């Protein structure tokens, strides 16, 4: 894999990034018409590879470019008691921000908090006040969730990706990797990736629960750039299990490689498993 020096920020003022994002909108597979996948993939790949400070403003501008103008912010309007659930959000600009915020919050357990925080702060700089999102997705974790509940929710979330295979993976970890096993269940899934796996999409404050494919889009967009062979194979398989058709998983994997190349990282899939290495799954019957 060849690493290239960082992109010249001035190049982002030309047609390079808008063209890339336009192509991503066309090529990234989605099962839902209003899916945010077209901006989440470049957001997550660029943040994983350290380009958030250059890319985030352009990604936000592109993601909202075809939306109607947000309603004007009123300094006299009463504060909202609580952010509406994602399904009830009436401001499409704020919903875009919510998806971007939650994608970066989830990604921090995969790519590291510093890069996620950098991207979140860059996002906050460019979001106008009328599109600011004050949702607190994990508020319940502070209020009423016991450790046992968190473990159960984590197992429910992790099982949507690994199904019965998680038993063998956890058995492999148990002798010498008990901390990693605990983190995977309680923190990675129970707190970051699937904090409301026990809720229905209608009652969950997590926007990712509105579309079962988004979690796989997030995990692949953050682990493929890191070239972690086992995790990539597991999550290619998990994407099929979470409802993405095999050929769309292939297209997603290829598009992640395109964005990696634009970030200066070539051949990210070289020598790494592809969807062709995934056995036929029950969901494909």
Give the positions of each predicted feature.
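Acidic, glycine/proline-rich low-complexity segments that act as flexible tails and inter-domain linkers
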Residues: 1-212, 261-285
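Alpha-helical oligomerization segments
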Residues: 203-285
């Amino acid at each position: 894999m060849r690493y290239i020096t960082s992109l010249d920020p001035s190049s982002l003022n030309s047609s390079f990034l808008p063209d890339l994002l336009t192509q991503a909108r066309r090529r990234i597979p989605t099962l839902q018409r209003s899916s945010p996948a077209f901006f989440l993939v470049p957001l997550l790949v660029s943040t994983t590879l350290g380009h958030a400070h250059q890319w985030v403003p352009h990604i936000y501008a592109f993601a909202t470019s075809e939306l109607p103008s947000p309603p004007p912010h009123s300094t006299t309007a009463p504060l909202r008691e609580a952010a509406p659930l994602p399904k009830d959000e009436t401001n499409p600009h704020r919903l875009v921000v919510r998806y971007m915020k939650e994608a970066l919050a989830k990604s921090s357990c995969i790519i590291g908090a510093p890069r996620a925080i950098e991207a979140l702060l860059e996002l906050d700089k460019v979001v106008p006040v009328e599109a600011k999102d004050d949702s607190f997705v994990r508020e319940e974790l502070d209020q009423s969730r016991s450790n046992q509940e968190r473990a159960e929710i984590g197992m429910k979330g992790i099982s949507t990706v690994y199904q019965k295979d998680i038993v063998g993976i956890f058995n492999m970890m148990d002798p010498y990797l008990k901390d990693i096993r605990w983190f995977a269940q309680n923190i990675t899934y129970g707190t970051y990736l699937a904090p409301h796996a026990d809720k229905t999409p209608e009652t969950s404050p997590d926007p990712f629960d509105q579309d079962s494919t988004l979690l796989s889009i997030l995990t692949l967009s953050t682990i493929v750039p890191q070239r972690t062979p086992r995790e990539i194979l597991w999550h290619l398989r998990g994407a099929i299990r979470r409802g993405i058709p095999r050929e769309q998983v292939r297209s997603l994997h290829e598009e992640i490689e395109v964005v990696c190349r634009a970030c200066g990282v070539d051949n990210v899939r070289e020598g790494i498993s592809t969807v062709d290495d995934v056995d036929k799954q029950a969901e494909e019957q």
